[in-house]
């Protein structure tokens, strides 16, 4: 049986050993190699499962994403599900699917992710944003914990996104764009391109008119992720009119 052969492969054992030594960053290429061993017999799924088991959701996503380009879909591994806070400081937080959608796009669930711009951890928080949000939440700010404590990072990121959603009256495309490009730019784009929340333009066209390619792509991908998660969490079809919220 191929699964037995896969599990007994010295490279699979090497990945598990690296996990035990807390050195999983060295297992990325091994997992990608294992994924290619025998696709017909399920090496991609087994490699994605292995990545998940050693806590590397990012490698699991990368293997699954590559497979999806060739019409092989492993949503369980391509869209990991972790707990997100429902209530923080007595306030209701945004739905699980939007926080998962942002986290997948920001870091592929890599708790140690660091961007060239200085954004940190699972939800890619800039240090000045994290400091501000920690103060609002009345918790101690710790730069180290942004990349060493996933729960700390997700709590701060969720609280921050919730404040953006409140600022934009629960209009998801605005809040998502602001999370990526900053609230100031979203105010500018609403002024220049029209405001879909006031029926001046529809959401699809408003997103297409976002000046920055990175932010435009970001909003599209997060909304896409959100709707996949919506389906995965509810197991019910997502209605088109609910696509943007």
Place the predicted regions along the sequence by residue.
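Catalytic glycan-binding domains that act on GlcNAc-containing polysaccharides
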Residues: 2-5, 14, 21, 26-245
């Amino acid at each position: 049986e191929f699964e037995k052969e896969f599990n007994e492969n010295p490279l699979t054992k090497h990945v598990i050993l690296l996990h035990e030594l807390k050195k999983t960053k060295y297992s990325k290429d091994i997992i990608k190699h294992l994924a290619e061993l025998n696709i017909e017999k399920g090496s991609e799924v087994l490699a994605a499962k292995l990545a998940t088991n050693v806590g590397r959701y990012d490698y699991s996503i990368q293997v699954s994403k590559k497979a999806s380009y060739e019409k092989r879909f492993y949503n369980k591994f391509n869209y990991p599900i972790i707990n997100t806070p429902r209530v923080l400081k007595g306030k209701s937080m945004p739905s699980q699917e939007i926080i998962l959608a942002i986290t997948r796009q920001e870091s592929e669930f890599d708790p140690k992710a660091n961007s060239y711009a200085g954004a940190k951890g699972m939800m890619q928080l800039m240090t000045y944003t994290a400091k501000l949000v920690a103060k609002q939440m009345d918790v101690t700010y710790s730069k180290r914990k942004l990349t060493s404590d996933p729960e700390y990072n997700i709590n701060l990121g969720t609280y921050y996104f919730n404040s953006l959603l409140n600022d934009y009256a629960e209009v998801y495309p605005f809040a998502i764009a602001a999370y990526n490009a900053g609230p100031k730019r979203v105010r500018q784009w609403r002024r220049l391109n029209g405001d879909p929340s006031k029926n001046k333009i529809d959401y699809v066209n408003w997103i297409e008119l976002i000046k920055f390619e990175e932010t435009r792509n970001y909003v599209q991908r997060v909304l896409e992720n959100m709707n996949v998660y919506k389906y995965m969490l509810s197991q019910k079809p997502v209605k088109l009119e609910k696509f943007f919220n």
